[in-house]
Amino acid sequence: MRIDKNSRGTLALVFGISAIIAALLIVFVRIPWIVYPVVALLLWFCIWQLAFFRIPVRERKGSDRLVTSVADGRVVIIEKTYEKEYLKQECIQLSVYMNFFDVHANFWPVDGSVDYYKYYPGEHFFASKPKASEENEHSCVGIVTPSGQKIFFKQIAGGFARRIVCYAKWHSTSRSGEQCGIIKFGSRIDIFLPLDAEIKVEVGDYVRACETVLAELKA
């Protein structure tokens, strides 16, 4: 099992604090009905953190026309909107919300090259709120495919997410199925697609990064 390279410090801190708490309980408290449940809870929390920050092995379903999900989660928005930062035109917004139990590693949605990148520090409202897209901490990535189609996506931090990691670099290659970053704890991904893209999912669907095709771009 691979662990996200930017999360190893977080895991070391979690494991260290958990080990100290467990040791103090065992040495000083010595009351089984207190010690055993707390130690079990700490162990469960450490295992959950490992699962949370792992990089899953997935079958690659995307291409330069098939747009796959950037993250695991549930589709909460599919609507027509105006994207003013990169596309600068009417488009389709598709948003995926990640809860605490979803893998939070993010993956490139389509083959192409990075045409735009910008990071914004910001607030930490709950990611399910509409204003989170603009006011929360977020990073923005624009991708142009070999056929000239453009898509845009945002990694949005949530109420508990306090750090966004994005590996995008201007003019670097994006290949669907490869990791592009991670958001630590509950968060959201907004993807902006051309109006003529054929949407393959519906609001309420659970999607998986790399494997679930969100849309097909016109040739």
Predicted regions and their residues:
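Contiguous, well-folded functional domains in the mature portion of proteins
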Residues: M1-A219
